[in-house]
From Swiss-Prot:
Pfam families: UDPGT (PF00201). It is found in: Membrane. It catalyses: glucuronate acceptor + UDP-alpha-D-glucuronate = acceptor beta-D-glucuronoside + UDP + H(+). This is Putative UDP-glucuronosyltransferase ugt-55. PANTHER family: EG:EG0003.4 PROTEIN-RELATED (PTHR48043), UDP-GLUCURONOSYLTRANSFERASE UGT-55-RELATED (PTHR48043:SF34). One of its GO terms (molecular function) is glucuronosyltransferase activity. The keyword Signal applies. Its EC number is 2.4.1.17. The chain crosses the membrane at residues 487-507. It comes from Caenorhabditis elegans.
Length: 512
């Protein structure tokens, strides 16, 4: 009998063996913040390319951005159109305007996160009202597990309504406060809130302030959950339902993030969303031929530059003109009076930037950025220097961590009004600094194969967890922690009791 050759065996395994391992997966993807959408879509596409049956609930909060899904490998997309209430809430652009004007204090983060929470809540309520569109299409399918990012928490209710208890939590940033708290991974007294401006550690005098940042995220979660739990008719709170999750994957890298307590069911996959750079178009090549030093300026898609306060715009343009030998390429999303007035000289305005292509060209001397997680990882991968101006959310923490890890300089948002401070920051960011360059080179080298490594880690972990395993381990028996609100109440009660006691002692001693 003739033995099968090695190529024949490989062909049989790839074409007939893989389907035996095929899993049916439900992915919940709210279309709201582009970087989050891209991260979740990348995971869905990866699983589809692997041969798994992937169904995506595409909950469209913003129709102006793509869902980033590869329809050639996705089995089914259940699309939920934008709620009229959500369209109305987003139309006035009050949220990005607030991002530009707010201070990074717990009360202000709480206020703007509540605005976001209400938008997610309204869209989820609309989704629930579309019973026939969503649940009737999905209830006849048997899913092995679900995948969602616990930012918009509608996915928790969808999974519970469909009887999906096994799930994977994603985070396109670092670990989210409420998730860490709900799963019992580590205490809020130890961990800097993702909304805070603390890095690897919290100073003693900052403990209460950090707890208030944690409380702001809890409020964002509860703005949604308090209404959605009865709407989905869940038998347990959304917070408790999170504990049935089996795995969590974070868009972080150990050399670029803070050190913190960990769990064996939590994995870092920073770099999994890296894109392959394309050759630069002639317009950029021609620009680069005119200048030896190029500075890229972009504050992300959620906080467009045209909504920036005028005083910041004027400071930046005046400062840029003080560097005549540098070309500044500024992502500015519309033509307006400001761009018309400042088109001359060494500043070029672009509504869209091929950011990865520009960074990987090795022509960029400095990237002035808002410090979003994806942007930072892409920049570190390209070994490009950054000047971070954090605006909202996790960006303040990202900036502080990068500063503490010797990877970047930081220019605070309110400093954008001071031309001398902006000038000094750009000068510092472009001057010789061997320690900074060595740190960036080390991180860049470690990120070189991060995409492939992260993809392999994700696929191997997910497949080993859910293939032929009816009861994979979860977070159900992890310790239950006090909430940030409870700890704040205890601390404030102790402080009030102590103050009252001291007051009584002083009164008795000096007045009686």
């Amino acid at each position: 009998m003739q033995l099968l050759t090695l190529p024949t065996l490989i062909f049989i395994f790839l074409n007939y063996g893989t389907p035996c391992l095929s899993l049916r997966i439900l992915v919940y993807s709210p279309r709201m913040i582009p970087s989050h959408v891209a991260f979740v879509a990348n995971i869905a596409n990866l699983l589809g390319q692997r041969g798994h049956n992937v169904v995506v609930v595409d909950n469209v909060l913003r129709s102006d951005i793509s869902n980033k899904l590869d329809l050639k490998v996705i089995e089914k997309v259940v699309k939920v159109e934008t709620s009229a209430n959500v369209a109305k809430l987003l139309a006035d652009q009050s949220i990005p305007i607030n991002f530009w004007s707010m201070r990074n204090e717990p009360e202000e983060q709480k206020k703007v996160m509540k605005q976001l929470g209400i938008i997610f809540l309204e869209q989820c309520k609309y989704l629930v009202s579309k019973e026939e569109t969503v649940f009737n299409e999905l209830k006849h399918l048997e899913f092995d597990f679900g995948i969602h990012e616990v930012f918009d928490i509608c996915g928790i209710g969808i999974f519970e309504k469909l009887g999906i208890r096994k799930s994977v939590i994603l985070s396109s940033t670092g670990m989210r406060d409420i998730v860490n708290e709900a799963l019992g991974i580590s205490s809020q007294l130890q961990d800097a809130s993702i909304l805070s401006d603390y890095g690897n550690s919290i100073p003693f005098y900052g403990i209460r302030r950090n707890l208030k940042f944690h409380s702001a995220w809890r409020n964002f979660f509860e703005v949604q959950s308090k209404t959605l739990e009865p709407l989905f008719e869940t038998t347990s709170s959304f917070e408790n339902l999170l504990r049935f999750s089996n795995l969590m994957f974070l868009n972080t890298h150990e050399l670029a993030d803070a050190h913190r307590p960990w769990s064996r069911r939590v994995h870092e996959i920073g770099g999994i969303s890296f894109k392959f750079p394309m050759p630069l178009k002639n317009e950029y090549i021609n620009l680069f031929n005119k200048y030896n030093s190029i500075i890229l300026v972009s504050f992300g898609t959620t906080t467009p530059s045209f909504l920036m306060p005028e005083k910041y715009k004027n400071t930046l343009i005046n400062t840029f003109q003080r560097f005549p030998d540098f070309l500044f390429i500024w992502k500015y999303e519309k033509d307006d009076e400001f761009t018309q007035k400042n088109k001359k000289g060494n500043v070029v305005f672009k509504k869209f930037l091929p950011q990865v292509d520009l960074l990987e060209s090795r022509k960029i001397k400095l990237f002035i950025t808002h410090g979003g997680q994806n942007s930072l990882l892409e920049t570190f991968h390209s070994n490009t220097r950054t000047l971070i101006t954090p605006l909202f959310g996790d960006q303040h923490r990202n900036a502080q961590i990068a500063l503490e890890n010797g990877l970047s300089h930081v220019l605070l948002k309110d400093q954008l009004a001071n031309e001398e401070l902006v000038y000094a920051a750009i000068k510092q960011g472009t001057e010789s600094n061997k320690k900074l360059d060595d740190n960036l080179l080390k991180l860049s080298s470690n990120l070189k194969n991060a995409k492939q490594t992260s993809e392999n880690l994700f696929l191997d972990t997910v497949e080993s967890t859910y293939t032929d395993n009816l009861s994979p381990l979860n977070f159900e028996f992890y310790p239950k922690l006090y909430s940030s609100d409870q700890i704040l109440l205890y601390l404030d009660s102790i402080a009030m009791f102590t103050l009252t006691l001291l007051t009584m002692i002083l009164i008795r001693k000096f007045l009686l």
